[in-house]
């Protein structure tokens, strides 16, 4: 099963389970949780079932395209079901079967691993899912988002698509993953992404102008707060996301000290909380 087919299979399966399929959000983000369809839609008492591919950027994890299993940008497949179905774990296991895995012939373990995002003011009870010793999925039951307790507990299922693909295709190097294949011609993950891994690593670790980025961070925060004064949660949240990504680039660049780090995280959390509160208020209008 190619990388593309894994995505198509998961989209089809979760659509059959009642999820709408939305598209990736057009802002850099460190994880699928940052998407408005998760962060904001987890709030309120309205049921919400959604699935989508989440391109994710973590600048500090870049390795110039030289590490066989570590990437500065990668893909998650995100599922949110609110409220959480009682059989969510069963639904997940059936999704693995849809991908061609015989779950009776593999060691599948749910390892307790409660999740927290300090920048988003979010946390939940959770488990890592290990497939024959390799983590492939994170399960989380959201308890709080943007510092606000969740009225309905959402189940978040986050697949690591590259890890699943490496397992399903029996590859030891992420760049050898078969992205697509037709008429005997193979396109690999490396064909699609290796150059970008090198160039973004070069930028994030060596070239990024820290003075400009520090100013961007402050400007994004100011704009977010200014928008929130008008009660507009969604455009404000865009600037919260930009501030978070800018922080991540500064962190990769080595420009943020240990003592500064907590201050930056608290600033982003304040923005995220403001967006969450504004969104929650909009639901009551």
Swiss-Prot record:
SUPFAM superfamilies found in the cross-reference section: Class II aaRS and biotin synthetases
* Cellular component per GO, a single term: cytosol
Quote one Gene Ontology molecular function term.
ATP binding
Enzyme class per UniProt:
ligase
Q: Where's it found, cell-wise?
A: Cytoplasm
Gene Ontology biological process: glycyl-tRNA aminoacylation
The EC number(s) attached to this protein equal 6.1.1.14
User: Does the entry feature the keyword Zinc, yes or no?
Assistant: no
Q: What's the chief localization of this chain?
A: cytoplasm
Write out the catalysed reaction. Answer: tRNA(Gly) + glycine + ATP = glycyl-tRNA(Gly) + AMP + diphosphate
The record ties this protein, via InterPro entries, to:
aa-tRNA-synth_II/BPL/LPL, Gly-tRNA-synth_heterodimer, Gly-tRNA_ligase_asu
Q: Which UniProt keywords apply?
A: Aminoacyl-tRNA synthetase, ATP-binding, Cytoplasm, Ligase, Nucleotide-binding, Protein biosynthesis
Q: Which family does it belong to?
A: Belongs to the class-II aminoacyl-tRNA synthetase family.
| UniProt subunit comment | Tetramer of two alpha and two beta subunits.
| Alphabetical list of NCBIfam families matching this protein | glyQ (TIGR00388), PRK09348.1 (NF006827)
Protein name stated in the entry: Glycine--tRNA ligase alpha subunit
Q: Which organism is it from?
A: Campylobacter fetus subsp. fetus (strain 82-40)
